[in-house]
Design a protein with these regions (language model features):
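Preference for bulky hydrophobic residues occupying beta-strand positions
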Residues: 8, 53, 80-82, 100, ...
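Glycine-rich portal/gate segments that line the openings of hydrophobic small-molecule binding cavities
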Residues: 38-88, 105, 140-150
Length: 150
């Protein structure tokens, strides 16, 4: 699946935005439908950190999903992927990753969030719908960053 990217300039400085987006415990403050984060294991800083997100479904149920940071370059880029093997998500997804990139822009921060989702099997037929859904999710995430820092 192609990469979906959304960008926005946030009025907060890069170090503040970095502090928010690079700490998994902050995800409920800005990432859509995340009610809480558990089991954060920060192995040597941000890179290789692992955590469990409790996601709220539209029906109000909680769904657990495990993630790990695969790349971190302070204060420029934070990348995480969902651990899919052995989970119900594995039936539909081959890969799911998020990259947050930060650039200084006139005292504020240019935030780019990209999602890359590779669908598996018959789920690939829903690709256009998934692209729209991911775009909306990334817009909500940018709204969340703005709310959390302004």
């Amino acid at each position: 699946m192609p990469r979906i990217t959304r960008r926005r300039t946030i009025s907060a400085p890069v170090p503040e935005v970095w502090g928010l987006v690079s700490d998994p415990y902050n995800l409920p403050r800005w990432w859509p439908r995340t009610s809480r984060v558990e089991n954060v294991d920060s192995k040597g800083g941000g890179r290789r950190a692992e955590w469990t997100k409790l996601l709220e479904t539209a029906e109000g149920r909680g769904v657990r999903a495990d993630f790990r940071c695969v790349s971190s370059a302070e204060p420029e880029r934070y990348v995480w992927e969902q651990e899919l093997e052995g989970t119900p998500f594995e039936r539909h997804l081959r890969r799911y990753g998020i990259e947050v990139a930060l650039d200084d822009e006139d005292g504020g921060t240019r935030v780019s969030i990209a999602a890359q989702q590779t669908l598996r099997g018959l789920s690939r037929l829903g690709s256009p719908m998934m692209r729209r859904g991911q775009g909306a999710l990334l817009d909500e995430a940018l709204d969340g960053i703005e709310r959390a820092l302004t």
